[in-house]
């Protein structure tokens, strides 16, 4: 009998984070529960006591010639490399898929912020004569998805979302919709962010380092979603089925429980819950999760605007076959998302 998890499935995963490059370092961090954050050097902020989740194990030269790597910003490097890893995880070989039916949707917080800083610094100090045209393409938030699509020949739908702490979830929400409509057979989806000293100084001046004292991070967390019939035709290994999804906007003060009810009421019980963004700070949400094993990646690898990508990868790595999982994401001003997954191949559950 068909279920809600039979239409869209997950066939590939990829992770780059402070835990390391690839799925195994993230799996190890989830298993031992030890934070991979490191101390921010004193010269960055002028004081000690702060931590960040830098992806220090990532070396672009491990994946491409140095001259080629120079044309990308750091966020695009994460996206290009992680997309290749995700496609390989899904068993999708280069040239072995229909480019027009394969797309990419990413959440991204700041894009190539280091490139933007350099581009604007030259402009402000030297005027228009100081502008470096080669830098500009990597200053926009959609550069990572665009560069990944060019490198991997993904000619299907290509959209980037910048929506505070729910950027990756917004991408996931739309990617599922695209697949359901039949506009693509497969989608690479998730989140990517870079982190540099200028950002940290900006966060400090805005009071964000005290508000989110756990530490900010960088990296990429990507999933490959496919229409189930397409995945089965090519004999893909199915990691999980994608079930229902819901979203609500801003939780009105005094009516938070009503909003949470719209998000969660009537849904089957979950055996694992992952939290992203500021979901752990929403008291009515946390109350509803009492007694359910809970997973958060922010304390392990750091927080970013597209942290939901890594949280989703961690969720699916932790979800056993046949188990029901719930992923929740929130931003202080909304939106709020709830996604349902079922571990393993739904047809075999």
Label each region the model flagged:
Residues 185-186, 191-196, 200-205:
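Glycine-rich anion/phosphate-binding loop at the beta-strand->alpha-helix junction
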Residues 79-92, 141-144, 149-152, 157-190, ...:
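Active-site-proximal alpha-helical scaffold in enzymes
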Residues 112-115, 169-171, 195-199, 251-252:
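Short, well-ordered, mixed-charge alpha-helical segments that flank or form enzyme active sites
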Residues 9-10, 27, 31-147, 151-152, ...:
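Conserved beta-ketoacyl condensing-enzyme motif
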Residues 5-16, 23-24, 28-40, 204-277, ...:
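Condensing-enzyme catalytic core mediating Claisen C-C bond formation in acyl metabolism
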Residues 14, 62-71, 131, 155-171, ...:
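Cysteine-centered functional microenvironments
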Residues 2-5, 89-107, 118-133, 154-157, ...:
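Structural signature of cysteine-dependent C-C bond-forming condensing enzymes
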Residues 118-123, 200-209:
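Short, surface-exposed, charged loop/turn segments at secondary-structure junctions
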């Amino acid at each position: 009998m068909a279920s809600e998890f039979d239409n869209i499935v997950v066939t590939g995963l990829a992770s780059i984070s402070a835990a390391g490059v690839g799925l195994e370092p993230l799996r190890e961090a989830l298993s031992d529960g030890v934070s991979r954050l490191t101390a921010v050097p004193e010269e960055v902020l002028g004081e000690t006591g702060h931590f960040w989740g830098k992806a220090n194990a990532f070396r672009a030269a491990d994946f491409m010639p140095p001259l080629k790597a120079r044309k990308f910003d750091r966020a695009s490097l994460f996206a290009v490399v992680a997309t290749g890893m995700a496609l390989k995880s899904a068993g999708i070989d280069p040239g072995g898929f229909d480019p027009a039916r394969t797309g990419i949707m990413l959440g991204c917080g700041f894009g190539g912020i280091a490139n933007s800083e350099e581009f604007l610094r030259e402009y402000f100090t030297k005027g228009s004569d100081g502008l470096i045209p080669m830098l500009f393409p990597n200053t926009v938030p959609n550069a990572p998805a665009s560069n990944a699509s060019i490198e991997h020949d993904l000619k299907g739908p290509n959209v980037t979302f910048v929506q505070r702490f729910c950027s990756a979830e917004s991408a996931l929400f739309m990617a599922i919709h695209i697949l359901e409509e039949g506009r693509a057979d497969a989608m690479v989806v998730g989140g990517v962010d870079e982190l540099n000293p200028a950002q940290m100084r900006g966060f400090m001046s805005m009071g964000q380092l005290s508000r989110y004292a756990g530490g900010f991070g960088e990296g990429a967390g990507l999933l490959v979603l496919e229409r189930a019939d397409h995945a089965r035709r090519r004999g893909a290994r199915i990691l999980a089925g994608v079930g229902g999804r819901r979203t609500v906007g801003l939780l009105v003060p005094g009516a938070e429980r009503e909003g949470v009810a719209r998000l969660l009421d009537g849904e089957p019980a979950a055996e694992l819950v992952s939290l992203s963004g500021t979901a752990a700070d929403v008291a009515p949400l946390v109350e509803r999760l009492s007694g359910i094993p809970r997973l958060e990646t922010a304390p392990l690898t750091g927080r970013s605007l597209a942290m939901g990508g890594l949280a989703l990868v961690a969720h699916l790595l932790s979800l056993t076959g046949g188990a029901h999982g719930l992923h929740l994401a929130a931003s202080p001003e909304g939106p709020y998302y709830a996604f349902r997954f079922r571990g393993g191949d739904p047809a075999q559950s």
